[in-house]
């Protein structure tokens, strides 16, 4: 997915800003946090974060959850380069492994309702003829 932040700001400007941040804030990493397109989760109020190097991915997810006021029954997932980073990993480790060439770490978040409110399955929409070739007695 293309980053809206990248679309709005030229590479040179992003790189200069990330370099300035790295020089000024040695104990923080610059992170751009954006919602996955077409996700059914609220939009975050700000995209740019200076994240402490000792913050875990799980703690950062908590920050995102609070900023978007996500109800407890909704799940949230974050992705870095299409990878779901381990919850216990430090942001600094993820940054070193996945930072963009402009110096920012790009984090995408998405959500789906996985707790409590499951939609009923409409059995009338299933093509039962596909199951006629199964010989369950052999198994």
Swiss-Prot record:
Residues where lipid is bound covalently (Phosphatidylethanolamine amidated glycine): 116
Localization terms from the record: Cytoplasmic vesicle, Autophagosome membrane; Vacuole membrane
Pfam family, one: ATG8
Positions of the record's site feature: Cleavage: 116-117
Lineage: superkingdom: Eukaryota
UniProt propeptide residues: 117-139
Biological process terms in GO annotation: autophagy; protein transport
Membrane protein topology class: Lipid-anchor
GO annotations of cellular component type: autophagosome membrane; cytoplasmic vesicle
Alphabetically ordered keywords of this record: Autophagy, Cytoplasmic vesicle, Lipoprotein, Membrane, Protein transport, Transport, Ubl conjugation pathway, Vacuole
Modified how: The C-terminal 23 residues are removed by ATG4 to expose Gly-116 at the C-terminus. The c-terminal Gly is then amidated with phosphatidylethanolamine by an activating system similar to that for ubiquitin.
Described function: Ubiquitin-like modifier involved in autophagosome formation. With ATG4, mediates the delivery of the autophagosomes to the vacuole via the microtubule cytoskeleton. Required for selective autophagic degradation of the nucleus (nucleophagy) as well as for mitophagy which contributes to regulate mitochondrial quantity and quality by eliminating the mitochondria to a basal level to fulfill cellular energy requirements and preventing excess ROS production. Participates also in membrane fusion events that take place in the early secretory pathway.
Family label: Belongs to the ATG8 family.
Name by which UniProt lists this protein: Autophagy-related protein 8
């Amino acid at each position: 997915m293309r980053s809206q932040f990248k679309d709005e700001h030229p590479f040179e400007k992003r790189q200069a800003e990330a370099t300035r941040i790295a020089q000024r804030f040695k104990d923080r990493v610059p992170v751009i946090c954006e919602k996955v397109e077409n996700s059914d989760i609220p939009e975050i109020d700000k995209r740019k974060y200076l994240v402490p190097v000792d913050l875990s991915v799980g703690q950062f997810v908590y920050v995102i959850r609070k900023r978007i006021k996500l109800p407890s029954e909704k799940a949230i997932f974050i992705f870095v380069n299409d990878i779901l980073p381990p919850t216990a990993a430090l942001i600094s480790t993820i940054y070193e492994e996945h930072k963009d060439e402009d110096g920012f770490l790009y984090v995408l978040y998405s959500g789906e309702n996985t707790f409590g409110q499951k939609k009923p399955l409409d059995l009338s929409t299933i093509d039962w003829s596909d199951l006629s070739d199964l010989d369950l007695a052999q198994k």
